[in-house]
Each structure stands twice: as C-alpha cells, then as structure tokens.
A protein has these predicted regions:
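Class I SAM-dependent methyltransferase SAM/SAH-binding core
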Residues: 65, 69-115
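Conserved class I S-adenosyl-L-methionine
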Residues: 2-59, 73, 94, 156-182, 239-240
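Acceptor-substrate binding/catalytic loop of class I
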Residues: 187-203
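A C-terminal cap/extension of S-adenosyl-L-methionine-dependent methyltransferases
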Residues: 170-172, 202-206, 216-266
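Short catalytic micro-motifs in class I SAM-dependent methyltransferases
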Residues: 130-131
C-alpha cells in the first residue's frame, strides 16, 4: 500500500480496493515516483521529510521496516542505520522500482497495511511517512504497527494535520466547511472520493496512547509548504529555515505534517 497522492490528478490514477471492508489505495497504475516526486517540484517537501527523519530515527537499528514506503524514496536515510531493512508497500510497481534501485540492500514485501505478514515483535524500529491520509481506520493500523514492534521498539510516524494555519483562515473566512478545531478526522472526498483523511493532533495523540505508544518527541514539518514561498525564496533558503523551526514550532502543531517519535510501551 502506498500513501501520498494529494491532488485530484493523482488520485484519478489510483485504484481503490477493499480489504476486510477497508479501502486500500493501490498505486499499481500510477507512477508515484515520477509523477508525484520527480516531476512535481517537491524538492522542499522531500528535504523537509529527510530533515525530520535524520533527527528522529535511531542511529543504530537491528531490524527496521519502512511501512507504506513506496519506491524507497527515503531508503538512503535509514539503510546506513539498519542491520536489516525491509520496505513494505501495497503497490507491486513501487516495490519493483525499489528493487531496481537498491537490489539486495533492501528487502521488499508486498501486502495489506491492515493485516501485515510480519510476526509479533519482529522489528526494533519502523517508519511511516505520508500514509495516514489514506487510512479509513487509523486505530487498526496503529494496533498492527504495535503488534509487529518489539517491546520498547521505536516508531517514527508522520501524520497529516488538519489544524494548519491556512485551513484555519479558510474556515474563518467561509472558504471551507472543514472545521480544523473539530477533533474528529476530516474526510476530504473532493481530493479522493474514497477518502482522504486529515487529523487533529489531539485525536492522534490520544490514539497513540490508546494503542500502546508513548510520545517521545514531536517535530513540525513542511512548515513552508507553499508554491509562492518556494518560488520567492527557493528551496535552499526554505530548508535552512525549516531546520531551525521544526523543533520550536512543534509545540503549536500548525504544520501540514506532524512527525512523532514513539516508543512501544505495551
């Protein structure tokens, strides 16, 4: 399963199937690597993700898995830190692209996020980035991630935030009916008719506790995700500023991506 088409054009090329009555976003008919990343001017977003991951992932990991990791976009961040690394995704196309680039350095597994093929406590650490917006049942996903982590294992999870400043202004000025202060997830079906979920930080943080995780660190990521800002200031300047504010701005939870470093406690 892959997770990250954020435009109408992208979602139009993605099939949706059902698994145990849950929607699965199938990127097999969509070249996520080329269309969404390589040809779409998202260098800033990519570097912002990498900045956060370098801060949050453990320096040394025995058995690591990148959940819904697509074609291995972030593999160069975790391969040097892991004795063994696995890339898990629903899309066979994404996994084929990963194997072409990384070969035997990265183990690839295809499957359903709601019922992964992994053993209880198999991994010491995991990463999940740009995935939560496709989950019909986030709690079930978190319980599955908890199951495959060993006791005390680390999970670095990115969450699509509904409580951003632009969304607040759109709501205040009646340009959007989506209430960013409502703690329930918003389902933005105008982006994807089968569901495109954004989450209130309080909602996901309660879910983390409910599903056996403790929050150890939080970062505010992609704080300057704006075509206008990228055009005016350029990627290099924005990333320099991004590095400076990811930690300090975490307390207000206003960025489109919120990164959490979690520990499995039960």
């Amino acid at each position: 399963m892959k997770t990250s088409a954020t435009t109408k054009d992208a979602s139009a090329n993605i099939k949706n199937t059902k698994s145990d009555h849950k929607v699965i976003s199938d990127y097999n008919g969509y070249n996520y690597k080329k269309v969404f990343w390589e040809d779409s001017g998202r260098e800033y977003e990519d570097l912002a993700d990498r900045t956060a991951i370098r801060r949050l992932l453990p320096k040394n990991m025995d058995n690591f898995v990148d959940i819904c990791g697509g074609y291995g976009r972030l593999a160069n961040e975790y391969l040097p830190r892991a004795k063994r690394a696995t890339l898990f995704d629903y899309s066979k196309l994404n996994l084929e692209q990963a194997r072409e680039e990384f070969g035997d350095k990265l183990h690839t597994v295809q499957g359903d996020i709601y019922k992964t093929p992994f053993s209880d406590g198999e991994f010491s650490a995991l990463l999940m980035v740009r995935a939560t917006h496709h989950f019909e049942n986030l709690e079930q996903v978190l319980r599955e991630l908890n199951r495959i982590l060993e006791p005390g294992g680390v999970a670095v999870i990115e969450v699509a935030n509904k409580r951003t400043l632009p969304k607040m202004f759109r709501y205040w000025f009646k340009r959007s009916s989506v209430n960013p202060f409502d703690k329930q997830p918003s389902n933005l079906k105008e982006i994807d008719k089968d569901g495109f979920y954004n989450y209130h930080p309080a909602y996901v943080e309660d879910l983390f506790k409910k599903t056996g995780f403790e929050i150890m660190d939080v970062l505010s990521v992609s704080n300057f995700r704006s075509r206008t800002m990228k055009k005016i200031f350029g990627t290099k300047a924005l990333i320099k500023l991004e590095k400076a504010v990811q930690g300090p701005l975490a307390s207000v939870r206003f960025a489109p991506s919120i990164y959490y470093r979690l520990i499995k406690t039960k």
